[in-house]
Amino acid sequence: MPVPIIETCRKRKRKPKVYNLQRFGEDGFPIQRNGAFRDQIRVFLRDCAEIEDYDIRGMTVWCTLLSHETKSSLIPLYIVEENVKHSSEPYCDHCRCTGWSNHFVSKRKYHFIIPIDTEWSLPLEDDAFDSQSHVLHGLIHCNGFGHLVCVNGMESGSKYLCGREIVDFWDRLCNSLGARMITVEDLAKKRSVELRLLYGVAYGHSWFGRWGYKFCCGSFGVTKNEYENAIEALGSLEIDQIEFDFGELRQSKEINQVFRYYREMSEGHLKTFRDLLRFMLIIKSHASPQKLLPVTPPLLTDSPHQKRSSRLLLKKSDVADNDKSPKYRNYSTVAANLGSRWPVRRLIFAAEVIVESLKEMKALKQNGMTRQDVRDSARLHIGDTGLLDYVLKSMNNVVVGDVLVRRYVDPITRILHYTIQDLDDAVKAKEPKKKEAVVLEEITPLRILTPLKPGADVYGDLLLLYTNVLLNYPESELVRSATQAILDSKHFIKEWPIWDNNDTVLQFLCRINPSLVDVRSEQTTELPPGELVTVPLQATVYDLKQAIEETFRDTYCILSNFVVTEIDEVEEDMSLIGSCSALTVRGHGIDLESKLKCQGGCDTWMVKCICRARDDDGERMISCDVCEVWQHTRCCGIDDSDTLPPLFVCSNCCEEFAEQQRKVLQPKYEFPSSENVFLLESADDFFGDQRCLGMIFPEENYLL
């Protein structure tokens, strides 16, 4: 795989710069950390990367080659500088969903991308920012705030890098470049297990917690305190209490066997559910496929209903190639086992749209379509590019409707293609030819597989406890709500301290006085972050003002003409303030009319959900057609697999409307209370005799 990259470098008459992946970012390698991210990234691109001979929608692309010391491979790291003023998406959805809607729009974004292995020798495509198939995609704004967008290790298709190696590299890269804060949306899964729930209960933090990522904000109104309480509630469950609560339930026998096995292995040191999960994860990390735990292997027992056979007949072709024949799977089955954040129904619909595009091309006598062409055609019907990328990634040797979908890489262009074949033809092609049979002389009784015993498959034991204890605890609202709170906590953040190891300069964290920019609203209450400004030790107040102006003008769109007039904490003497102090500045030249003001955009939408959410958290929402307030579909009783109704009225507007209708439909006179009834012997006296009305009410009470 690395050869084409080197050949490309030779053709461009430049010597490639190659850096060790495992050492990258450590101890000043390849660059020393001396300042803010906006300065560090420029040094990095100048000294450690080479400009590619193509661009993405007019944006410059750099490439740095990384060598893996144990896999003997070269890995390309692409860096793309996105100019916000010329971007089709100037606002940052990741900022908005992590509570940074009030951050000023920065002038530049830097994308760090390691593509999937099969695309290492290919140029980045125009839709590279939207793809979810990259091994690594990180985004950092020029102010040092950024996001880890996606990580796909060996579980997700990478042949060279596991998830831990990828995040290790990203963490060192961020530290070397002087990143301020990085967020991540933790959707990591191990097959069907949500790792943020499993690791949260076992270790008290998410899978990303080992790199210092902590709770940032929860979806559906979950707070940091609720998240921490939920982790403590589940982790502190007593194992004995769990056994008692499951009682005589069908699955209690298996659960008790797992408890007993690992308790005996730990010599009785496991008391709580956290102790048990942590112990099992430690065992799992040290277990090898060749050497299982010292327990009975998977039982293979004879079936009493099968006739024994002393000989097994196999075709010659099967003996040689029984593992090489392709396996066709129905895509509905594949989609159901993917564990995707999209509903299965949407995955199947997207697959059907893709197949229709391939059928249209086949009708024109074209032999297949490139991945990009398929994607572009499907986008006419489905706007969610992330969904399309996810489905395309899983479509190979799958049956959709009456056709078989296959993909292949063109050996010349190295471009991925998709083709379809009628199912009948595919079945005929798969049927083996009749060949002479050979006899295997060994006696092979027919056997069936029975369930594993505890300890034979640690992951299977974890899955048993995860499914039953965490997801289906019997009759416990506490466990159910705690589990849901952890699952609804997806956004985590890591903050790097200000680097102050340079004795030759002074650094200050400078923020504009809030009275100059009204960024507060019902959605956001925190002020935008301060910006790191560096000046020499001998700098004067005038020098500091000049440095602040240059920094703000270079970083934020609305501050291109900003002029500093005053620093609240400094008058004339710089010696009164120390390095790393926070400063508040005043001035003029702020473009308050600019659309590129805050990352939340210039729309005046409002979020006010019954779950207490007051800002966009990235979850599915719907707007009331009357009051235009946004609420979560889940909180409104709309399932994720359901389509949005064409007309939606929230419960508050429904209640107001119902109250108005009730007033309209009520009788003209209210039913009298005991205070204003003069004469009333029965209900018939009130409703049946109009002549009594004058005696019943001292005065008329009109409702409208």
Swiss-Prot record:
The main location class comes to: nucleus
Q: Which CDD domains match?
A: PHD_MMD1_like (cd15556)
| Zn finger (PHD-type) start-end | 606-656
What is the protein name stated in its UniProt record?
A: PHD finger protein MALE MEIOCYTE DEATH 1
Task: Tell me the null mutant phenotype.
Answer: Male sterile that lacks pollen and undergoes an aberrant male meiosis resulting in the formation of two uni- to tri-nucleate cells instead of a normal tetrad, accompanied by aberrant chromosomal organization from diplotene followed by metaphase 1 arrest. After, male meiocytes exhibit signs of apoptosis, including defects in chromosome behavior, cytoplasmic shrinkage, and chromatin fragmentation, followed by cell death before cytokinesis. Reduced expression of several condensin genes in meiocytes leading to defective meiotic chromosome condensation in male meiocytes.
Relate the assembly described in the record. Answer: Interacts with JMJ16 in the nucleus of male meiocytes, especially on pachytene chromosomes.
Subcellular location(s) of the protein: Nucleus
PANTHER family recorded for this chain? Answer: PHD FINGER PROTEIN MALE MEIOCYTE DEATH 1, PHD FINGER PROTEIN MALE MEIOCYTE DEATH 1-RELATED
Please tell me whether the keyword Cell cycle is annotated for this protein. Answer: no
Which residues does UniProt assign to the signal peptide?
none
Which positions in this protein are listed as binding Zn(2+) 1? 609, 611, 632, 635
GO molecular function per UniProt: DNA binding; euchromatin binding; histone binding; sequence-specific DNA binding; transcription cis-regulatory region binding; zinc ion binding
Q: Which GO terms describe its biological process?
A: male meiosis chromosome segregation; male meiotic nuclear division; meiotic cell cycle; meiotic chromosome condensation; meiotic spindle organization; pollen sperm cell differentiation; positive regulation of chromosome condensation; positive regulation of gene expression
Kindly list the positions annotated as binding Zn(2+) 2: 624, 627, 650, 653
Q: Which SUPFAM superfamilies match?
A: FYVE/PHD zinc finger
Q: What GO CC terms are in its UniProt record?
A: euchromatin; nucleus
Keyword Zinc-finger in annotation: yes
Keyword vocabulary terms for this entry: Meiosis, Metal-binding, Nucleus, Transcription, Transcription regulation, Zinc, Zinc-finger
Q: What species does this protein belong to? A: Arabidopsis thaliana (Mouse-ear cress)
> What SMART domains does the database record attribute to this sequence?
PHD
Summarizing the function annotation, the protein's role is: Probable transcription factor required for chromosome organization and progression during male meiosis (e.g. microsporogenesis). Necessary for fertility and meiotic progressive compaction of prophase I chromosomes to metaphase I bivalents. Together with JMJ16, promotes gene expression in male meiocytes in an H3K9me3-dependent manner, and contributes to meiotic chromosome condensation by triggering some condensin promoters (e.g. CAP-D3 and CAP-H).
Which tissues express it?
Expressed in inflorescence, specifically in male meiocytes.
InterPro entries, sorted: Zinc_finger_PHD-type_CS, Znf_FYVE_PHD, Znf_PHD, Znf_PHD-finger, Znf_RING/FYVE/PHD
